[in-house]
Curated annotation (Swiss-Prot):
<dbReference type="GO" id="GO:0008168">
    <property type="term" value="F:methyltransferase activity"/>
</dbReference>
<keyword id="KW-0489">Methyltransferase</keyword>
<keyword id="KW-1133">Transmembrane helix</keyword>
<feature type="transmembrane region" description="Helical">
    <location>
        <begin position="3"/>
        <end position="23"/>
    </location>
</feature>
<keyword id="KW-0812">Transmembrane</keyword>
<keyword id="KW-0808">Transferase</keyword>
<dbReference type="GO" id="GO:0032259">
    <property type="term" value="P:methylation"/>
</dbReference>
<dbReference type="InterPro" id="IPR007318">
    <property type="entry name" value="Phopholipid_MeTrfase"/>
</dbReference>
<keyword id="KW-1003">Cell membrane</keyword>
<feature type="transmembrane region" description="Helical">
    <location>
        <begin position="51"/>
        <end position="71"/>
    </location>
</feature>
<feature type="transmembrane region" description="Helical">
    <location>
        <begin position="82"/>
        <end position="102"/>
    </location>
</feature>
<protein>
    <recommendedName>
        <fullName>PEMT/PEM2 methyltransferase family protein</fullName>
        <ecNumber>2.1.1.-</ecNumber>
    </recommendedName>
</protein>
<comment type="similarity">
    <text>Belongs to the class VI-like SAM-binding methyltransferase superfamily. PEMT/PEM2 methyltransferase family.</text>
</comment>
<keyword id="KW-0472">Membrane</keyword>
<dbReference type="GO" id="GO:0005886">
    <property type="term" value="C:plasma membrane"/>
</dbReference>
<dbReference type="Pfam" id="PF04191">
    <property type="entry name" value="PEMT"/>
</dbReference>
<feature type="transmembrane region" description="Helical">
    <location>
        <begin position="141"/>
        <end position="161"/>
    </location>
</feature>
Length: 197
């Protein structure tokens, strides 16, 4: 397996997210990135998310540029270190990355990174959001599972678990916010559509 493919896949998703953020900024005059830096739960979740993303990027770059050194330092998880699982991992990374990008674009002007102080966009409940309340996060978790299979080492597992915990916490904070903003409409949506899938 090419050690650069996982890095390339994650960079494509990252660049797509950056392009969308720039586009939304140009269209609305405001950044869709609303992560806070406060000392409250939301600020902590934002810092944790940024730390996990930075660690994942550094890890995948190290794997791509110095595969022998990373393998020597971390070893590989033997049960996951097979060509078939590597291929499945790359497929999951591609699927998850694609789902993440499509879900971000599908939200149009409602897409934000973080919880906005003022909700000025409609609740999105159609398209991918008719099947999952959180298809962006479903895509991210799918890509992370793929990363563990494509790059089967302890750091990949630790980052995937950390991200899952962080995402699960973020979802619950967003649900509280959306329930306050959209009230009964959001409650009805929650009864109709599951949190994950």
């Amino acid at each position: 397996m090419s050690t650069t493919l996982p890095t390339i896949l994650m960079l494509v998703v990252g660049l797509s997210t950056l392009a969308l953020a720039i586009l939304r900024r140009v269209q609305s005059g405001r950044s869709p990135v609303v992560l806070t830096y406060g000392d409250d739960a939301e600020g902590f979740a934002g810092r944790l998310f940024r730390l996990i993303v930075a660690a994942l990027v550094i890890h995948l770059l190290a794997v791509a540029m110095l595969p022998a050194s990373v393998d020597a330092a971390l070893g590989r998880i033997p049960a996951l270190d097979t060509p078939i699982l590597h291929a499945v991992g790359l497929a999951l990374m591609t699927l998850g990355g694609g789902l993440t990008m499509l879900s971000q674009w599908a939200m149009r002007h409602s897409w934000k990174i973080g919880i906005p102080e003022k909700q000025d966009a409609p609740l999105v409940t159609s398209g991918l959001y008719a099947f999952s309340r959180n298809p962006i996060y479903v895509g991210m978790v799918t890509a992370l599972i793929g990363t563990v299979m494509a790059v089967p080492n302890v750091i990949s597992v630790a980052l995937a678990l950390s991200a899952w915990i962080s995402i699960s916490y973020q979802i619950r904070m967003e649900e509280t916010h959306l329930a306050k903003v959209f009230g009964d409409a959001y409650g009805a949506y929650c009864r109709r559509v599951r949190r994950w899938v």
